[in-house]
Amino acid sequence: MKMAIVTGAARGIGLATARFFVDQGYQVAMVDRDEDALDAAAASLAGGTAFVCDVSDPAAVDEMVAAVLAVSGRIDCLVNNAGVADFCSIEDTSFARWRTVMATNLDGVYLCSRAVLAALKQSRGSIVNIASISGLRASTLRVAYGTSKAGVIHLTQQFAAEMGEFGIRVNCVAPGPVRTKLAIAVHSQAIIDAYHDAIPLNRYGSEAEIAEAIVFLGSEKASYITGQTLAVDGGFGSTGVGLPALRD
């Protein structure tokens, strides 16, 4: 049975992605640093196994990958979904705050991807990184977050360029506004209205819609796609419209 690793799998897009992989007949290694939430998520999903790990810790990542291989003997897909959201002005973004964002959002993607390469060479598998539309276009209050996600997009291309000769595909999904619990909690009505006005489809995406794109890129259905970033954003990136509501 094929094995997919999904980081940040305790909730949201990561959990939705794990469910879709299970539906496709995969075993899923569900990775997160929030042990309680991860255990609850894994208990709700037949075919999912919890692996507690902080992806910004190199030793912890190596241990996690070794543990997954001990269980499954193979890795066919890695989804680098773990991330932290941080919205702060440039002047108020300390270097410590900057590094906290980079450690998970960019370093974690590099560490996990590098750790699975030997296994993916054997399976001729794939990596799907989760960036953001904030990595494709600049916006206010996202100096660390947006830069980290832009780094993920370029890292995707670097890995694709170098790993293609081994049959490893590496792609990226850049979600637009998604109706997650976090978004519902932190987005004011003014922000929601502004997004709706700027999105041609006039709504937020769902976790399931993002997960569908991730699983597609990770599967053999995308066998001739590598080094690409797929914006799943309802057309938001095509409008070129700024959102004044996000300045507050």
Features from the language model and the residues they span:
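Substrate-binding pocket helix/loop in short-chain dehydrogenase/reductase
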Residues: 89-90, 97-99, 195
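Short C-terminal tail/terminal secondary-structure segment
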Residues: 137, 226-248
